[in-house]
Amino acid sequence: MTTIFWAGDSTVQYNDILTFPQTGIGQVMNLFLKPEVRVENHAKNGRSTKSFIDESRLTPIYDKITAGDFLFIQFGHNDEKKNDPERYTDPHSDYMVNLEKFVNAARNKGAWPVFITPLERRCFIDEEHLDIGEHTDYVAAMKQTAENLNVPLIDLYSMSRAEMRKAGAEKTKEWYMHLPAGVYPSHMDGLPDNT
């Protein structure tokens, strides 16, 4: 059986009833896979490449991953937090070095690393126009690292921006955690989260 391991942040992590309706990509991926492929999701809310590694979250992946498995690597949202030294990474130095650590962990075990650029934040300046992307430096750094290390890359950043442009500002509120007050026990005060 092939396993897809995920390393990432809240946009990927498995959520339960306590955080519903938040849903990570890795949480629902198995719905689109054949039965002989399983998902093992190690993504954790709020993590950057730095904090994920510093907290030894890569270790259990390394211990379990085997030849023919995949390691999907999706970070950027929290790496860009300059005021948080436990998470911040410079996009063109630390971030790229950390991405290489994930690649090496997979390849050392005969597995396949795959980079996935961060999902774009919902950043409209009006109903039809998106602001300049918030993750551009990290997207560029991931693309450069993918090229340098010959790692396949899925450009979720560009795809998500294109879909947001087509849908418009109001419709995309449904795709993000824009929650009305009094509806969800996990967010009784409501929530306007564009991540």
List each language-model region with its residue ranges.
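Structural motif
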Residues: 48-56
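Gly/Ser/Thr-rich beta-alpha loop segments that engage phosphate groups in nucleotides
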Residues: 10, 48, 78
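Residues that cap or flank secondary-structure elements
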Residues: 17, 21, 53, 94, ...
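Alpha-helical cap/lid subdomain in secreted, periplasmic
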Residues: 57-195
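Active-site environment of divalent metal-dependent phosphoester hydrolases
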Residues: 14, 49, 161
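Serine-esterase "nucleophile elbow" of acetyl-processing enzymes
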Residues: 1-44, 59-67
